[in-house]
Every structure is written in C-alpha cells, then in structure tokens.
Amino acid sequence: MSKANASAERIKDTISSVSNLVKVDSEEDAEIRGKGYVVFDDVSFSYEGTTRAISNISFVLERGKTLGIIGGTGSGKSTIINLMMRFYDTDKGRIYIDGKDIRSYDLPELRKHFGVVFQNDFIFHDTISSNIKIGRDISDEEMKKAAENAMASSFIEKYEDGYQHQAAIH
C-alpha cells in the first residue's frame, strides 16, 4: 500500500509541475510532422532538490532506428523519457524533435506521439482490442495500426477471434 501511495504522490507532483513548463515563443505552434528525428543536445537535468539525474547527454535518434538506453536503478533512463514527453524541462541543453525545440510544441500534440511501455506488464481482463485502445476513443483501423507499429499484429491475427481474443497473462 505504501508503494501505491508513493506512486500516487509522484503522479500528483508530476501533473502539478506541468504548469511550470516554459513554452518557446514561435510564430505558430509547431506541429509534429512524423519525421521522427530526435536530438538530445548536451542535456542535463536535476529533480528539485536532488543531485543531477543526467549530465551532458547527447544523442541523435533517426526514424526507424533503435536506441538502447541501459543502466542501473537511478541512472536516468526514465528521466530521458520524462524530458522527451515534457513532464519536465531541461536544466541545460536542448531537445529537438524534427528540428524544432520541443518547447515549441503544444503539450497534447507532443504527447500524442508517444507510447509508453511500463517495466511491469499489466493486461486488463478484456479483449486484445480493448487493451490496445485502453480507454481511448480510436477506430479499429487506428488500433490495428498501433498493433502493427508494435509488431504485435502477426501473433494477434493468429488467434481465431483475432483482436477480440480475451487477453490473459499465463
């Protein structure tokens, strides 16, 4: 129960911190065009009142390429994702998506391009389709495209009832 309380407190803190984010002035809100080009340029970040979570991180991630980020607990892996999704702003350096500073993107526009896979797997006792949609109002076509992008469609379609198959962890 204490883990759940701690997690709830972190979520509350994260949500309330969003209002402190700085938006870069631009002629118009930048729109992500789906090129998928991400650049971390000398990025450093510290959570409030703590030592540096990451220091001077630089990398380029091109569309269709994979970047493996490994490290022990507390090494900054989740921090990199939190910064890309703008739960926080960097202390130093910049993050660019498709050549534009991520601070120029509207938060909902930015975040709709991310999918997060948690370290602990969890499946709702429901259909595969419902687990992919997870409460979002999207079409079956969009849901199937998400499965294709996650390279899951081939095994899902092997089930006789496909996306309507009851999901379960064995």
Over which residues does each language-model region extend?
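Cytosolic ends of transmembrane helices, especially the final helix of ABC transmembrane type-1 domains
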Residues: 1-14
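A generic local structural motif
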Residues: 8, 24-26, 101-104
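ABC-type nucleotide-binding domain
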Residues: 16, 31-170
